[in-house]
């Protein structure tokens, strides 16, 4: 971890790296949908091509209408993004559309195992970091489609011992 301090790294980022580090991404095309800091960026060298989209920043993509062709990305990282999108179902459909067959989409949301059911209030709540919703365990139902496999990884951060869920979605053939 040369070049940055552990204080710059969040538990969710370390947990995601634990999952990603077990997979060979050589030559794969990555879409990274946030600025997750140096730990994730250190993984970029594992990929053949990397595109990063930062909301209202560098290469900002509208996830409900992604301006890319079908089957463009082999890997998509969507970390703490969906709760900020009004129409998250449309965003999920778009992510699946631009994901290649056999591609992998990794999704993380804040505390999905705390509540049984998602609480969606239909507006960005300023008391909840502008989130439209707090996902519950039922997020898996929202992610499931006929042509995808959803696997939940419960990962423990090795420093804080905080537990995080990383959803790994693999797009199967149509």
Describe the predicted segments one by one.
Residues 79-84:
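Short catalytic micro-motifs in class I SAM-dependent methyltransferases
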